[in-house]
């Protein structure tokens, strides 16, 4: 989507981000895919950012654990990474350039599922992008954990369609938060709106 809306001070816009990595060890593993989406506060999609597979050598992909090797082969990300010429710095700069059209620096929390892990990787491999976000996180997985504790039936309506690619994971996270928003009263024992 092209930028059609100017950044307005009163708008509450949310930046959704997802990364695919070679594993979960922030000191050893690496970001291999990044995508972003901007929504308004009502979770309406305003813009879809660039989606990048980040170049890595075959030996780094082969060093991944079995789950990651199988998943990234199945999703097609493996081949996209091998074919890519995009480096971390290019993906970071292009993502920031996109976000600057939609959201002011520091105005949006980092939004997504298990987003603390993504923030750790960004801090190490894309620090300028990590600093673009507010220090707060909007982590959908927190609501999932709370629903599991307080109102497990809410989880029945969560449907994941993602292929474990960054962009599809973002859309799953947005859909999941929409589902929880409909059930917010249930968390506190209030009637569902």
From Swiss-Prot:
Any one GO BP annotation for this protein: DNA metabolic process
EC number: 3.1.15.-
InterPro entries found in the cross-reference section: Exonuclease_RNaseT/DNA_pol3, Oligoribonuclease, RNaseH-like_sf, RNaseH_sf
Tree of life domain: Bacteria
Pfam family, one: RNase_T
The keyword Cytoplasm is annotated on this UniProt entry: yes
Subcellular location per the Swiss-Prot or TrEMBL entry: Cytoplasm
Residues annotated as the enzyme's active site: 135
Gene Ontology molecular function, alphabetical: 3'-5'-RNA exonuclease activity; nucleic acid binding
GO cellular component: cytoplasm
Domain Exonuclease positions: 14-177
SUPFAM superfamilies to which the protein is assigned, alphabetical: Ribonuclease H-like
Main location: cytoplasm
SMART domains: EXOIII (SM00479)
Keyword terms, alphabetized: Cytoplasm, Exonuclease, Hydrolase, Nuclease
Known role: 3'-to-5' exoribonuclease specific for small oligoribonucleotides.
Stored PANTHER family: OLIGORIBONUCLEASE, MITOCHONDRIAL
Family, as annotated: Belongs to the oligoribonuclease family.
Name of the protein: Oligoribonuclease
Organism: Xylella fastidiosa (strain 9a5c)
Source species taxonomy: Bacteria, Pseudomonadati, Pseudomonadota, Gammaproteobacteria, Lysobacterales
